[in-house]
Amino acid sequence: PAEAQGTVRLPERRDPVGNCSIVWIPSLSRPSLDSLRYAAKVSDQVIGVWVRSEEDDPAMIRRDWQRLVGESHGIQLHILESPFSSLVDPFVAFVASEEQLHPDVTHTIVMPMAIPRYSFDSLLLNQRGINMQRALDASGNRVFTLVRYYLPA
């Protein structure tokens, strides 16, 4: 389960790294939490971004975030509205906004990617993430990190 590894924390550092990781959070699952943990290791600031659909309850998302991630300094959650059921556009706009607000900081886009046992399953499983990466690639020079999670058999 996602809770098994404990909460996500930024390590204490003497000198800032100069990196902010923006982590796409499609759900509070093991791949997403592994992505947050990776981002915390390589960044001074971590921003988890959840683009919510109409069915998602923001209060429940925040409650689960609090339980799994906690109130760690330097790790934030942003819940974005999804007009017209688009998950890609709000995330791309958020990334562009952060880059514009903080041009002196390197921004790394961290995306969880589930790796299924059978390769043909990956065509459907990660389609949203692939579309997200393509949209972000099209609009500028960005650093991407894919955090892979191999699904059990």
Question: Which functions belong to the PLM regions below?
Answer:
Residues 1-153:
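Cytosolic C-terminal regulatory domains/tails of membrane transporters and channels
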